[in-house]
């Protein structure tokens, strides 16, 4: 979805139009990712059993957490992160990548010490949601006010 709309966004000159298209793409992407995530979470026990064997069935819950975490990334962050370069703003992505990486490292360290392996999922999900909100706020500002 994002790849198809990238060129449309890049060619559009009206910021309000870009914003409106982007909101629709964001909702479509979140919907598709939501469906895939539910399917992945439901099928995780079978996937793990088929691919790794019954010996690893205890990883099913953790697998489900990571389906959700990566859905947060794809459903919240990916649209503005990919559309910013389409409107000529790429530096922000580099800055956000560095900040997200540092924040992720710090939060993961403390989350794992508190929650064990589950802390990795919690920290990753937290960073994805927070950075995703920052991306959308900045993207909106660039579309509507610059």
Listing of model-derived features with the role each one plays in the protein:
Residues 1-15, 80-86:
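Helix-loop junctions and terminal segments of transmembrane helices
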Residues 8, 33-38, 67-74, 97-101, ...:
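Residue-level hotspots within the lipid-embedded alpha helices of multi-pass solute transporters
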Residues 13, 51, 87-89, 115:
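Membrane-helix interface residues
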Residues 19-29, 63, 82-106, 118-121, ...:
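Alpha-helical transmembrane segments of multi-pass membrane transporters/permeases
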Residues 42-71:
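Interfacial segments at transmembrane-helix termini and the short loops linking adjacent helices
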Residues 44-49, 99-133:
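Membrane-interface helix-loop junctions in multi-pass transport and translocation proteins
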Residues 128-144:
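Multi-pass alpha-helical transporter architecture, strongest
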């Amino acid at each position: 979805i994002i790849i198809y709309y990238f060129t449309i966004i890049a060619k559009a000159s009206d910021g309000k139009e870009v914003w409106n298209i982007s909101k629709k793409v964001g909702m479509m992407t979140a919907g598709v990712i939501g469906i895939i995530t539910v399917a992945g979470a439901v099928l995780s026990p079978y996937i793990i059993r088929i691919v790794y064997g019954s010996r690893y069935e205890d990883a099913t819950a953790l697998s489900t957490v990571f389906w959700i975490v990566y859905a947060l990334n794809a459903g919240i962050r990916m649209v503005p992160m990919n559309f910013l370069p389409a409107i000529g703003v790429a530096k922000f992505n580099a800055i956000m990548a560095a900040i997200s990486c540092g924040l992720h490292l710090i939060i993961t360290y403390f989350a794992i010490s508190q929650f064990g392996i589950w802390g990795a999922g919690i920290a990753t999900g937290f960073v994805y949601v927070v950075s995703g909100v920052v991306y959308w706020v900045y993207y909106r500002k660039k579309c509507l006010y610059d």
